[in-house]
Every structure is written in structure tokens, then in C-alpha cells.
């Protein structure tokens, strides 16, 4: 991965101009993916716009931020309705503005679904949210994939503690942060993970859910930092598994929580993840050359092979044949594929593995049991040996206690 920001080496102006032209040509020939981390202060809000124009709004900050920040931005972009909303969990700094946005847009402001973790919660913000979304409310499930079009998908990696805590999950039985929806946004070689306020340490209120889901996420380009940079999230096991090239911290200046903490910032720096922060916050300081405070929105534009963040250029993922090192990895090549796809993987446990292929609806397409070694080639057929149609598929490789997942695109 190359970054004009992360390595401390900035491209000469001439090369940057040439790159801008190339990116412009790519955008003109194929619309890309756009992700905007809106600055809603000490809250969360992420807008995803697929290459086909499908929109997904993940959280909308505190009450007041919906009409004060999110709605004006949507209107400035000519967005009169949303296809999807996602509530990562029911804390007011995440859902407080969702009802405001939905109520203020057009009559059919929500086209498809309002996705959340289900169950119930007893706060005014929750009641206002559920009233606004009405019959469009749907409970998201683990493994569910939302096809946003143009090759962009969002997969639910975890919800309601990833099975760690026992149901029921309502009325404040557990701290909401333990129950967060974790999403993996995928577009070609680009991957970004968003997990609300998911905790990574065991305390009197929190449970380490991060370590349970890390392998299912795998290496990503961008990590939306959990819990505004609290030291109770982003543990070292999680970070060393997802290895984010870039980390985004959504935080408010002068917050009373001391976010982001210096401990959290140091963890991100230790895995060489360049930091973009919406506001100054009230805690730790990003070391020189390791990140920047944007004081505004964080805008990510993704085209095949690369992405930019507020003008800084990065390469997406790892192309071609994957490396063979590392305790946990899964890569597929070629990807997209037209005939066969070879999966190269390593799970740090002995014994046979099972490989399962799913379609975007979560239906089992094929399964291969008692696979040994670290390479397997799928010929693109289903259980009944028929060739599967072109589209997006997911592979899951499972051992007795570990599993890895990745996306395949068949042409």
C-alpha cells in the first residue's frame, strides 16, 4: 500500500497532477464508491454512496445533528431520499439524528430499509427513531449482505455480541456497546470496517467482542475507530489482525470523556495506521507525521485500485498472488474471476477445514469438507455441479475454532 501521507513521502507536484488526471479518467469511465465521515462532533455518522448512486447512512450523531449537520449535507449533494439507514446501536450519539433526517426528507425518504440490531431499548431517542422508520425497520443478521450496486457490498460481520452474550438483548440488560452492528464495506480491493462503539476489553460493563470478530474481518484498508477513540476499544489483537492502513476517529472537541485517549492513538501508530480525526477532541495527541486533525468531514473517494482521503492518495489492498506469511490470512485470486478462483489461506490450527460458498442472500452455494493444506481452487459450480451465474459471492473457511471470510466476484 502506498500513501502520500502514511510514509512521510509526498509525491512531486507533477506526479500528483498526472495521478489526478488518471483518477479523473477512471472516474469518468467507471463511477466509484464514496464514503463520507460527517463531522457530527462527539458522535458517529457515515454516508456511503455506491457507484450506482445507492445510499446508506450509518448513524447520524446526537439529537440536533440530524437537522443541523447531516440534512444540510445531504441537501447540498441533492440527496432527497436514502436507500438504507443503519443504526449501529441505540445510544443517542448514534441514533439521535436519524429520525430528524428521515422526517425532514421527502415523503418516501427511506426507500428500502432501516437496519438495526432488533430488540428494544427504553430511551426517547430510540422511540423517536423507531417511530420515524416505521414499517421500514428490519433486523440485520450476521452474514447478511446488502448489495449496493456497482460492485459495492456491505456485510454484517457481527451483531448482538456475536453470540458471546445470551439473549434477550433488550431494555438495557447489557451495555449497548457490546451489541453493536459491525459492517464490512467491500468494493473491489477496497475494504472498510465500521463497528460503532464495539468494545475490546473486559470490564464491569464491557466484553471483548473485538477479538471474537477480528478474523472474520481480516485485513482492511480503513478502520472507523470504535467508540471515538476510547481506550476500551481497538485492542492489540484486533488491530494486528485487521491491520488498517488508515484509521478514522470521529470525535468532538472539548468532550468530557477524554477521547481520543493517548493509549488508543499509540496503538494505531504501532500498527502503522495513518490517522484522520474529525475534530481535535479532548485527549491524546497524534504524533507528527502519523495523522492529522481534519476539523471537518472526512471524504473518501474509491476507484478501482486506489482511493483518496481529503486529497491524500492510497493504493487499495494487495493485488495479485497473496503472500504466504502470517498466522491468519485469506486471499482469492484472480478476483474477479471467470473460470476458477484459487483461495490461499492459513488458519493457525491443525486438522481439516471446511470451505463454504454463499451468495449475496446468504444461501449456501457449495461446500467442501475436510479440506487439507492451505490452497483450494473453486471451479465456479454449485452443489449440483452447475455453473453459477456471474455476481458476488462469499467464501468462508472454517476450522474447529477459527474462521476467515472474503468476497469473490464472478464475471
Feature names for model-found ranges:
Residues 2-16:
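Bacterial N-terminal signal peptides that target proteins for export
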Residues 14-24:
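Bacterial N-terminal signal peptides
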Residues 29-80, 139-222, 292-318:
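Core dinuclear metal-dependent hydrolase active-site scaffold
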Residues 42-44, 63-65, 90-96, 120-124, ...:
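Active-site environment of divalent metal-dependent phosphoester hydrolases
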Residues 51-56, 63-116, 212-228, 243-247:
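Active-site metal-binding motif and surrounding structural segment of the metallo-beta-lactamase
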Residues 259-320:
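C-terminal regulatory/interaction regions
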Residues 322-346, 358-363, 390, 407-411:
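Surface-exposed, proline-anchored Ser/Thr-rich loop/turn motifs
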Residues 369, 374-377, 386-411:
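C-terminal tail/sorting-segment detector
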